[in-house]
Amino acid sequence: MDIINIPTYLTLLRVVMVPFFTVMFYLPVRWAPMICTIMFFVAAVTDWFDGFLARRWKQTTSFGKFLDPVADKVMIVAALVLIAEHFHTWWVTLPASIIIIREVIILALREWVAAIGSRNGIGVLWISKIKTFVQMLALTALLWSSDEWIVIIGIVALYVSVLLTFWSMCLYLYIVRYDLFNY
């Protein structure tokens, strides 16, 4: 099976779109937030679509399984940095920081578990899929921030995603607890 297939191209597209929605975010034109949000939303949809196609067409690859969560993290962290800078307040920067810290910890944990050859591999948990969906919902709303209600929905979703972020991190740590304390 080829390493690079249509689902993998969609995942790569998600990574490639990050600098484009970042540049769009800073353009000094009235319609820039809407275009930035549309670009982010399209990238977010590819997250669902690439996995769906890979399973449906039986084109799952080890590279795709590795790249998909990395692409998610790159996209989410970039958007978190943008909204933290845009709102420039602790009540946005704090949850953004918590989410970024968790993502780095889990990526490092996955690398460590793979490096020690543990049988307790860290697959994607159902709670992580929900977390990613809520994060993308929050970030879509906050990048757009067209009116007060959209911002409120985005902030609420951001805080819900922080709770899901912490919960999923605890589950991952529980899965590898024996490796953490016995290695």
UniProtKB/Swiss-Prot annotation:
<feature type="topological domain" description="Cytoplasmic">
    <location>
        <begin position="170"/>
        <end position="182"/>
    </location>
</feature>
<keyword id="KW-0997">Cell inner membrane</keyword>
<keyword id="KW-1208">Phospholipid metabolism</keyword>
<keyword id="KW-0594">Phospholipid biosynthesis</keyword>
<dbReference type="GO" id="GO:0006655">
    <property type="term" value="P:phosphatidylglycerol biosynthetic process"/>
</dbReference>
<dbReference type="InterPro" id="IPR004570">
    <property type="entry name" value="Phosphatidylglycerol_P_synth"/>
</dbReference>
<keyword id="KW-0444">Lipid biosynthesis</keyword>
<dbReference type="InterPro" id="IPR000462">
    <property type="entry name" value="CDP-OH_P_trans"/>
</dbReference>
<feature type="transmembrane region" description="Helical">
    <location>
        <begin position="14"/>
        <end position="38"/>
    </location>
</feature>
<feature type="transmembrane region" description="Helical">
    <location>
        <begin position="147"/>
        <end position="169"/>
    </location>
</feature>
<comment type="similarity">
    <text>Belongs to the CDP-alcohol phosphatidyltransferase class-I family.</text>
</comment>
<feature type="transmembrane region" description="Helical">
    <location>
        <begin position="88"/>
        <end position="108"/>
    </location>
</feature>
<dbReference type="InterPro" id="IPR043130">
    <property type="entry name" value="CDP-OH_PTrfase_TM_dom"/>
</dbReference>
<keyword id="KW-0808">Transferase</keyword>
<dbReference type="InterPro" id="IPR048254">
    <property type="entry name" value="CDP_ALCOHOL_P_TRANSF_CS"/>
</dbReference>
<feature type="topological domain" description="Cytoplasmic">
    <location>
        <begin position="1"/>
        <end position="13"/>
    </location>
</feature>
<comment type="pathway">
    <text>Phospholipid metabolism; phosphatidylglycerol biosynthesis; phosphatidylglycerol from CDP-diacylglycerol: step 1/2.</text>
</comment>
<dbReference type="GO" id="GO:0008444">
    <property type="term" value="F:CDP-diacylglycerol-glycerol-3-phosphate 3-phosphatidyltransferase activity"/>
</dbReference>
<feature type="topological domain" description="Cytoplasmic">
    <location>
        <begin position="83"/>
        <end position="87"/>
    </location>
</feature>
<keyword id="KW-0443">Lipid metabolism</keyword>
<feature type="transmembrane region" description="Helical">
    <location>
        <begin position="62"/>
        <end position="82"/>
    </location>
</feature>
<keyword id="KW-0812">Transmembrane</keyword>
<feature type="topological domain" description="Periplasmic">
    <location>
        <begin position="109"/>
        <end position="146"/>
    </location>
</feature>
<protein>
    <recommendedName>
        <fullName>CDP-diacylglycerol--glycerol-3-phosphate 3-phosphatidyltransferase</fullName>
        <ecNumber>2.7.8.5</ecNumber>
    </recommendedName>
</protein>
<dbReference type="InterPro" id="IPR050324">
    <property type="entry name" value="CDP-alcohol_PTase-I"/>
</dbReference>
<comment type="function">
    <text>Catalyzes the conversion of cytidine diphosphate diacylglycerol (CDP-DG) and glycerol 3-phosphate into phosphatidylglycerol. Essential for the synthesis of anionic phospholipids, thereby playing a role in balancing the ratio of zwitterionic and anionic phospholipids, which is thought to be important for normal membrane function.</text>
</comment>
<keyword id="KW-1003">Cell membrane</keyword>
<feature type="topological domain" description="Periplasmic">
    <location>
        <begin position="39"/>
        <end position="61"/>
    </location>
</feature>
<dbReference type="InterPro" id="IPR023762">
    <property type="entry name" value="PGP_synthase_bac"/>
</dbReference>
<keyword id="KW-1133">Transmembrane helix</keyword>
<keyword id="KW-0472">Membrane</keyword>
<dbReference type="GO" id="GO:0005886">
    <property type="term" value="C:plasma membrane"/>
</dbReference>
<dbReference type="Pfam" id="PF01066">
    <property type="entry name" value="CDP-OH_P_transf"/>
</dbReference>
